[in-house]
Structure formats: structure tokens, C-alpha cells
């Protein structure tokens, strides 16, 4: 019996089920070495007779493996595409690409976009060059619009002075602020993040240095580690943090004697208590003195700015490096000296704040004064005090009064 040579060496024959989107189904028997393109031609010849007269018909269709949802590559064989016997294939016509727009259409679209584009400053000035100027004072009115966060600092400075005077009249003020001062001491000296401290000591740093580094860097392990490495050879690295000065110690020592000897009817005792309260106020403010972000200081100094200028910029901009850089490159306003200036006490805004009953009651609360001091040096803590049941109503009234007067 005569057998064709290609039949002898032919590969395994697979029976494949082919489907179309129109619902036609049939079986195709193909050797496993058949290319996907040849299989596609056979499928098109079966379902669309005469379609192969157009050579583009094959390229406009694709075969998809139904199980894996994979589009088969024309140049690969059935074996290379890992098609098995009895697999189902889907013959689909490819989506025609959108026609390219004509040049006239492109020009019309660009012209339409240009017509709808908002005019820039130069175009406005050119179009209005021949018009008479009117309402030129509007620029001044707009310039006088005040930002709440900018004015809040001035308001707080002035309110702190008022609160200090009111609290100085309270015979229990010294005792109240001694307790508040002790709370600040506890926060600074006793509350050290144990986990952060353990991480640094496990790296080999002495505990005393690790504690100092954490306090200087707001309990940030990364910044504390950088500080320890940078100051490893510093002879003053083991020096204690600035604490009580001799005058402060004497003031506290005098406090106990003043409590024992001074009474409400003693004028001399009242003066001593007032001086002691002033010292406590100064001590509280010193404890909240500004500490610049060391990484921001280094980054800005590398740009060529002087260290003092960098510290001033960070203080004015609440340790925000980008804002500090803009301040250094700009007109440098507000100046660091402006931060300690209060609002005009005769202004309608400040008078309206002082006349508010909620504010008046809050100014007699030592916690309000501590909140004002904290927000003065740490503006990011404003949200915390806004949510506090004692200080929140005071801050809310200040905000409402400011917004009301700022709109008039």
C-alpha cells in the first residue's frame, strides 16, 4: 500500500471545537505542528466561504482559547500554544481601529480649544489697555483681608498677657501653676518612650545619651540615632539638658516660704506671690522654646543660608522646610520679631473677643493659659485644644468672632 511521505512523519492530530460569535460550531482536525494562522484560514474558509480572496481577512480575525481566554499568536504552532485535544477555540473579528482624523478636522478642533482657552494676564492687559481705571481701591481692600492662622498668633500673645494679669489676682494661682509646672516637668523628664529607648540601647548607645537624644528629637528614633552619631565625639554630649537655673530654684524655694507667711491681707506677701507667678510663667515659656528640625537645618544650610537665618525661617514657618526655604528666598515676612508681637488691644477685633462671656470665663482657667502657650509654640497642637472640653469653646468663640468681623 502506498502511503504519502508527509502522512508518515505527520504529528499528532488534534480535534478542536471552533465557535463563532454568531453561534456556529464545528470540529477542526489539525496536526499539532499547524500554525495558528493556517488554522485561522481553515476556520474562515469553513464559516465564510470566499472570504480568503481578501488577504486582509485573516489579519482582521483572531483565535481565542476559551478556557484560558488567551489570544493565540499567528506565528506559533498549536503545540507551542499548548492546545490540547477537544479544546474549544473562539473565532472573533477584531475591532476596527478608529479612522485617523482629517487635517481639516484637526485644525478645527485646535481652533475650538484655543477659542475656549481662558485669556492670560498679558491678553487681559492688552484688551483693556484703552479702558479707564475704576475702583482702584479694591486692591487695598483685598490686601487687608486677614488670614486666621496668621492673626491667631497675635491674638494668643495678647490674650496670654491678659490671662496672666487675671490669674495673678487669684490667691490660689501660685499653687495651681506649681502643679501645672510639675506636670510639665513630668512630661519632659519622666515620659520617655521605653520602646524607642530600648532600640537605641540595643544598638550600643549609653542610656543617658539615648534619653537626651530622644528628648531633643521629639522621641523620633531615627533622628535621635542621627544625633547620637553626629555628636559621638562631642565633649558636651553627656551634659544635662538645660533645666532649672539658680534663679528658678530660688524662686521655687521662696514659693514655699511665701505660702507659709503670706496671707490675702499682706501686701508684701502679695507682691512676692506675684513675682513668683511671673517666674513660673517665664519658666513655662522657656520649656516650650522652639527646637528646629535638625535635618531641615542641615538641608537649608547646605543651600548656603546662615544657621541663624535658617533657625529663624523654621521658627516662623513651624519647622516646615519648604515654607522656610520660600521665606528665605522671599521678603522674609513676617519677621521672627513679629511672632512675639500681639494684636492691637484697642482694635475692634480684640475688644469683641474680650467682651465675649465664654472667653472671659476661660481666661480665668489656668488650663486655658497653658493651651495658649502650647499653641503659640506648637501650632500643630491647635486641633488637640479645639477638641478639649475646657479650652475648645474659647477657641471656637475666637474663631467665630474673627470670621464675623473679617467679612465686614
UniProtKB/Swiss-Prot annotation:
Keywords, alphabetical: Cytoplasm, Repeat, Ubl conjugation pathway
Biased composition (Low complexity): 245-268
Domain Ubiquitin-like residues, every copy: 14-98
Biased composition (Basic and acidic residues): 108-119
SUPFAM superfamilies: UBA-like, Ubiquitin-like
Compartment list: Cytoplasm
The name this protein goes by in its record: Ubiquitin-associated domain-containing protein 1
Protein source organism: Gallus gallus
Amino acid at each position: 500500500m502506498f502511503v504519502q511521505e508527509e502522512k508518515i512523519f505527520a504529528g499528532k492530530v488534534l480535534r478542536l471545537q471552533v465557535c463563532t460569535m454568531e453561534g456556529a460550531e464545528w470540529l477542526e482536525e489539525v496536526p499539532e505542528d499547524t500554525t495558528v494562522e493556517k488554522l485561522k484560514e481553515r476556520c474562515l474558509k469553513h464559516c465564510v466561504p470566499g472570504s480568503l480572496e481578501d488577504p486582509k481577512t485573516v489579519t482582521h480575525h483572531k483565535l481565542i482559547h476559551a478556557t484560558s481566554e488567551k489570544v493565540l499568536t499567528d506565528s506559533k504552532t498549536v503545540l507551542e500554544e499548548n492546545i490540547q485535544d477537544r479544546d474549544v477555540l473562539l473565532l472573533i473579528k477584531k475591532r476596527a481601529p478608529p479612522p485617523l482624523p482629517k487635517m481639516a478636522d484637526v485644525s478645527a478642533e485646535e481652533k475650538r480649544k484655543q477659542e475656549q482657552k481662558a485669556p492670560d494676564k498679558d491678553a487681559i492687559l492688552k484688551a483693556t489697555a484703552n479702558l479707564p481705571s475704576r475702583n482702584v481701591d479694591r486692591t487695598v481692600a483685598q490686601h487687608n483681608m486677614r488670614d486666621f492662622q496668621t492673626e491667631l498668633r497675635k491674638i494668643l500673645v495678647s490674650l496670654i498677657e491678659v490671662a496672666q494679669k487675671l490669674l495673678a489676682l487669684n490667691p490660689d494661682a501660685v499653687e495651681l501653676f506649681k502643679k501645672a509646672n510639675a506636670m510639665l516637668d513630668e512630661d519632659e523628664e519622666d515620659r520617655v518612650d521605653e520602646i524607642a529607648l530600648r532600640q537605641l540601647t540595643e544598638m550600643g548607645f549609653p542610656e543617658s545619651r539615648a534619653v537626651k537624644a530622644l528628648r531633643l528629637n521629639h522621641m523620633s528614633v531615627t533622628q535621635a540615632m542621627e544625633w547620637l552619631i553626629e555628636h559621638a565625639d562631642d565633649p558636651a554630649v553627656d551634659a544635662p539638658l538645660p533645666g532649672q537655673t539658680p534663679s528658678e530654684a530660688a524662686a521655687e524655694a521662696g514659693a514655699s516660704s511665701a505660702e507659709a507667711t503670706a496671707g490675702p491681707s499682706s501686701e508684701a506677701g502679695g507682691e512676692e506671690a506675684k513675682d513668683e507667678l511671673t517666674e513660673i510663667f517665664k519658666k513655662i515659656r522657656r520649656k516650650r522654646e522652639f527646637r528646629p528640625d535638625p535635618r531641615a537645618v542641615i538641608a537649608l544650610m547646605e543651600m548656603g543660608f546662615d544657621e541663624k537665618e535658617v533657625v529663624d525661617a523654621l521658627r516662623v514657618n513651624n519647622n516646615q522646610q519648604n515654607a522656610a526655604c520660600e521665606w528665605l528666598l522671599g521678603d522674609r515676612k513676617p519677621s521672627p520679631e513679629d511672632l512675639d508681637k500681639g494684636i492691637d488691644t484697642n482694635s475692634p477685633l480684640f475688644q469683641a473677643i474680650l467682651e465675649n462671656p465664654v472667653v472671659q470665663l476661660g481666661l480665668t482657667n489656668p488650663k486655658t493659659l497653658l493651651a495658649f502657650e502650647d499653641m503659640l509654640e506648637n501650632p500643630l497642637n491647635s486641633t488637640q485644644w479645639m477638641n478639649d472640653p475646657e479650652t475648645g469653646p474659647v477657641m471656637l468663640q475666637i474663631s467665630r468672632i474673627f470670621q464675623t468681623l473679617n467679612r465686614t
